[in-house]
Amino acid sequence: VEPNPAPRITIRYCTQCQWLLRSAWLAQELLQTFGPDLGEVALLPGTGGVFEIAYDGETIWERKADGGFPEAKVLKQRVRDRLDPERSLGHSDR
């Protein structure tokens, strides 16, 4: 049985809105928490107020639908629930 390939997380952000730093910070939070369990965290420049995070192509956060930007804790929980539902996130689970 082939192990599942490590997931790809994409963060599409609006360059006109200057959301690169926010995107990079969230990417760093995910990499710091999940490290080698993630295959890639990619930052994708966009326009038109876009801020969307996807896990292997499945949208897990969308700024307009979810009402703003995710807290790191909420984003980590959404990634964990797909990657390894049994994993404890320590203080991020409280």
Task: Give the location of each predicted region.
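Domain-level signature for proteins that mediate thiol-based redox and metal-cofactor handling
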Residues: 1-94
